[in-house]
Amino acid sequence: MTTEVLSGKPLAAIIQQRAHEETALLDDEGVRPVLAVVVATDDESTHWYVRSIERAAGRAGIGCRIIDLGHDATEQVLASVLADLSAEPTVHGIILQTPLPAAVRADRLVGLIAPEKDIDGANPLSLGRLAVGQPAFAPATAQAVVELLDHFQIPVAGRNVAVVGRSAVVGKPLSLLLLERDATVTICHSKSGPLERYTQPADVVVVAAGRTGLLKGSHLSPETVVIDVGTNVLPDGSLVGDVDEASVTGVAAGLSPVPGGVGSVTTALLLLHTVEAARQQSRSGLLTASTSRI
């Protein structure tokens, strides 16, 4: 069996172009979308990712402010910066980039991001709104998965989808987005037992556990579609996902690569969310856009 490569790059280009076009429309109204990214780490891969966001924002005409507080930033300093950015009218979107210093509680900080500027769905209010079907920005990585499935015309309505991982960033919000599309969702985690019990009956498997080589070909039935959300840095600096690509290739009907799959779509969605946030804030101050399909 030939396994289709579900590259995210063409979809990311479409989303980035849409962000650019909508930014131009806002520019005609005298509004320039601005994204603020708060960083508190010396992790080089994180800084590389943040720089990639900055470059992509520049191409779309979106302002991008990188607030680098250093790896020893305190929770109090981070809280003050987030509160100031939430109150700053010229900033439309805010990202609190992880990882954070060991002594810092991210769960206490994300609640300080104004929901209308929470373009990566980090505030618990955003996740709560998502759960009950109210307008809110979905976490960009979770939304990137469903956008990628839509782009390749892979249906989920009435089908079994196994989500491996239950984080508040991907697993939980993704399950909500899939339920909105009438999928039958199973969430797998470290206490679920043998993985194949849940992944073999699945039509679609999404892996977001942060464990290199977790999903193998033996865990799948033929024709399963696999979306790899994992981002694991190997000792040589290369990036791999959670899927054992060698054993899955030839079994799965489709597989998203790492890098070049979900990640590129995630970055593009962060930009589009920023533009949507700027539009709503400039016109009404109310958040009305979030999980609309591309």
Swiss-Prot record:
Family matches, as InterPro entries: Aminoacid_DH-like_N_sf, NAD(P)-bd_dom_sf, THF_DH/CycHdrlase, THF_DH/CycHdrlase_cat_dom, THF_DH/CycHdrlase_NAD-bd_dom
UniProt entry keywords in alphabetical sequence: Amino-acid biosynthesis, Histidine biosynthesis, Hydrolase, Methionine biosynthesis, Multifunctional enzyme, NADP, One-carbon metabolism, Oxidoreductase, Purine biosynthesis
Q: Which GO terms describe its molecular function?
A: methenyltetrahydrofolate cyclohydrolase activity; methylenetetrahydrofolate dehydrogenase (NADP+) activity
Q: Which GO terms describe its cellular component?
A: cytosol
Gene3D superfamilies, alphabetized: Leucine Dehydrogenase, chain A, domain 1, NAD(P)-binding Rossmann-like Domain
Q: Known catalysed reaction(s)?
A: (6R)-5,10-methylene-5,6,7,8-tetrahydrofolate + NADP(+) = (6R)-5,10-methenyltetrahydrofolate + NADPH; (6R)-5,10-methenyltetrahydrofolate + H2O = (6R)-10-formyltetrahydrofolate + H(+)
Name the EC number(s).
1.5.1.5, 3.5.4.9
Q: Which residues bind NADP(+)?
A: G165, R166, S167, S190, T231
Which CDD domains does the record cross-reference, listed alphabetically?
A: NAD_bind_m-THF_DH_Cyclohyd
Which processes are annotated in GO (biological process)? L-histidine biosynthetic process; methionine biosynthetic process; purine nucleotide biosynthetic process; tetrahydrofolate interconversion
- Quaternary organization: Homodimer.
**Similarity comment text for this entry:** Belongs to the tetrahydrofolate dehydrogenase/cyclohydrolase family.
Give a short account of what the protein does: Catalyzes the oxidation of 5,10-methylenetetrahydrofolate to 5,10-methenyltetrahydrofolate and then the hydrolysis of 5,10-methenyltetrahydrofolate to 10-formyltetrahydrofolate.
State the protein's name. Answer: Bifunctional protein FolD 1
